């Protein structure tokens, strides 16, 4: 069995019934009976003319077979869906490969509304190739409650407690980003016997749409979804990476906290110090004290943002040098600085650290042997070089761990927006422009950004990365529409971003949110004069994509008016149509077409599915 498809110029071959069954939701037996044929070049005479042209197939699909519904049923011979009109105990003459899987992908997510429209067919004819493709537009949306801030924003005497509220918000977000609170592992048993089913997973997903109901669970949504979908090996790696970032964050934060004096950690501990580093700053009682100090708002906001940006940007460059503490450096050993000893043993230490994790390594990387220089190393401040060495070692460890992740878990471009949000709040703090409006906006758009990133990551993995769906079904267009509404249900603003790829789309959407954050204003205040053209450039405004004055008016609306936000994800996909190579199915299809033609000529409605209809006799 060979199903040929050219989604992007390359020849793809579906070589077995298993892939076809997975993409159609049918059994292998059904596919074997169906005998799928993809390329009908020089074989077109085997099928009725109406069955092999886009117009004819569109008519049959809409009025006779109703493929938009039929493809979701069990089409195995003699199953209830195949009784009488129009199948007569056999599968249909066509199967839309990937259509059922697409609907399953959308159905398995937390969307409130799912709609599928514009099911169309197109033909590709080249020398030696005659193919038919289907395409459909999917529109899936859900609404998140952004107005229920509860303890996040809605507090009395806001102006008197602005600093404490800002620090509380930052502390809660940082706690979620670095998992300083041990997350609940699993949901336990999610359904009970008989009529007492309790949809726990559904209830938890619904709760994540309400920033007030989920409370502290509002933060860290993207990473929670990522961890929940990870396999055992990926879970070990992601947990270790999180511990490394947490330890690194606490290492720099500890000197700013009024904690009780603790015995300082002596390094380099024979230069194999990573395990002690994690135990000290991510797993010990001192880590819990740091967590409590964060909640008690004992750390300056600027320090918090610098530390979290440095930690979350790992393994990339931080951009800001930080000073840490809680380590006692040993004196120079053998006329060599301790940090130089750490640098020389870094590669071997990292390899041994990864090897000790409870997982099977994908490959063994050769440890480069550093060149030994005879001259004395220049005398530089040991504290600074030591802290640089700590970051370099942690960054290289995280980079090596990320290489061990599977492709889906390694795909992180959707989750890199947090650093940008922290940089915005850091910049506003430095300018002294923190007020109720900006804090409210920061919380809301961070919450919205996590939802957009999480959903786009899910769709990207299922539609573009997952095999075999990503090989045979092509994503043509992706669009995100954000509609903010007030308590009366009226639209406060509506913006759409559309691109030809999900990766670019998420960058575009988050850039839009980040651009709106610094627009400081009171309720009803317009964007400052001279800033309108700059703002339109920052949000990548395209000509004829909306009235400029209306967009500026929408931006000037106070975010306190926004009670909910509807997020719609629209995408168009194209997949292959396969024809049945079974002669009996082809003959039944010819008789069904003749019967439908007679019904139309007599101005009678076409029969309903499974209705008893006597077909015309077969023609010789």
UniProtKB/Swiss-Prot annotation:
Q: What positions carry the motif Nuclear localization signal?
A: 356-365
Give GO MF terms, alphabetically.
double-stranded DNA binding; single-stranded DNA binding
The record's principal subcellular location, in a coarse class, is host cell
Matches recorded under InterPro entries: Adeno_preterminal
Q: GO CC annotation: what is one?
A: host cell nuclear matrix
Q: Where is this site: Priming of strand displacement replication by covalently linking the first nucleotide of the new DNA chain?
A: 545
Q: What does this protein do?
A: Protein covalently bound to the viral DNA that acts as a primer for viral genomic replication by DNA strand displacement. Assembles on the viral origin of replication in an initiation complex with viral polymerase, DBP, host NFIA and host POU2F1/OCT1. During initiation, the polymerase covalently couples the first dCTP with Ser-580 of pTP. The terminal protein stimulates the template activity over 20 fold compared to protein-free templates. Neo-synthesized viral genomes are linked to two preterminal proteins, one for each 5' end.
Q: Which family does it belong to?
A: Belongs to the adenoviridae terminal protein family.
Matching HAMAP family, A to Z? ADV_TERM
What protein is this chain from? Preterminal protein
């Amino acid at each position: 069995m060979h199903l040929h498809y050219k989604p992007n110029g390359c020849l793809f071959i579906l070589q077995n019934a298993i892939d076809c069954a997975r993409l159609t939701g049918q059994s292998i037996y059904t596919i074997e009976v169906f005998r799928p044929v993809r390329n009908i070049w020089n074989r077109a005479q085997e099928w009725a003319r109406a069955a092999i042209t886009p117009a004819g197939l569109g008519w049959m699909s809409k009025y006779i077979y109703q493929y938009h519904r039929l493809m979701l049923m069990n089409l195995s011979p003699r199953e209830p869906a195949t009784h009488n009109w129009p199948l007569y105990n056999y599968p249909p003459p066509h199967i839309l490969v990937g259509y059922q899987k697409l609907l399953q992908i959308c159905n398995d997510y937390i969307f409130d509304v799912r709609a599928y429209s514009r099911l169309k067919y197109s033909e590709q004819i080249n020398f030696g190739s005659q193919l038919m493709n289907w395409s459909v537009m999917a529109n899936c949306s859900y609404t998140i409650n952004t107005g229920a801030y509860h303890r996040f924003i809605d507090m009395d005497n806001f102006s008197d407690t602005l600093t404490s509220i800002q620090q509380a918000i930052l502390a809660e977000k940082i706690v979620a980003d670095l998992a300083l609170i041990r997350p609940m592992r699993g949901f336990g048993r999610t359904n009970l016997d008989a009529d007492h089913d309790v949809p726990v997973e559904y209830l938890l997903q619904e709760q994540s749409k309400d920033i007030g109901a989920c409370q502290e669970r509002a933060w860290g949504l993207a990473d929670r979804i990522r961890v929940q979908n990870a396999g055992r090996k990926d879970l070990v790696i992601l947990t270790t990476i999180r511990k490394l970032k947490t330890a690194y964050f606490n290492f720099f934060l500890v000197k700013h906290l009024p904690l009780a004096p603790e015995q300082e950690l002596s390094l380099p501990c024979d230069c194999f110090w990573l395990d002690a580093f994690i135990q000290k700053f991510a797993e010990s009682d001192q880590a819990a004290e740091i967590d409590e100090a964060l909640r008690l708002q004992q750390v300056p906001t600027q320090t918090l943002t610098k530390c979290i940006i440095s930690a979350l940007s790992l393994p990339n460059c931080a951009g800001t040098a930080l000073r840490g503490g809680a380590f006692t450096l040993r004196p120079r050993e053998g006329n060599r600085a301790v940090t130089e000893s750490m640098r020389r043993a870094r590669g071997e230490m990292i390899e041994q650290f990864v090897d000790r994790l409870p997982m099977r390594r994908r490959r063994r990387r050769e440890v480069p042997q550093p060149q030994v220089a005879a001259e004395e190393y220049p005398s530089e401040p040991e504290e600074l070089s030591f802290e640089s060495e700590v970051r370099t070692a942690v960054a290289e460890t995280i980079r090596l761990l990320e290489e061990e992740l599977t492709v889906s878990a390694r795909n992180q471009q959707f989750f890199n927006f947090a650093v940008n949000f922290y940089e915005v709040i850091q910049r506003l703090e430095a300018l002294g422009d923190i007020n109720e409006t900006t804090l409210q906006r920061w919380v809301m758009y961070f919450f919205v950004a996590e939802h957009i990133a999480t959903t786009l990551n899910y769709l990207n993995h299922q539609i573009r990365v997952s095999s075999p769906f990503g090989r045979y079904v092509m994503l043509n267009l992706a669009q995100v529409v954000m509609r903010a509404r007030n308590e009366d249900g009226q639209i406060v603003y509506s913006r759409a971003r559309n691109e030809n790829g999900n990766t670019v789309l998420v960058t575009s959407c988050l850039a839009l949110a980040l651009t709106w954050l610094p627009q400081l204003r009171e309720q009803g205040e317009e964007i400052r004069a001279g800033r309108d053209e700059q703002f339109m450039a920052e949000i990548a405004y395209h000509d004829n994509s909306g009235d400029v004055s209306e967009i500026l008016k929408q931006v000037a609306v106070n975010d306190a008016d926004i009670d909910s936000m509807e997020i719609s994800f629209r995408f168009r996909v194209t997949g292959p149509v396969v024809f049945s190579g079974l002669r009996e199915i082809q003959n039944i299809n010819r008789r069904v077409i003749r019967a439908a033609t007679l019904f139309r000529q007599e101005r009678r409605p076409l029969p309903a599915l499974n209705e008893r209809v006597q077909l015309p006799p077969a023609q010789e």
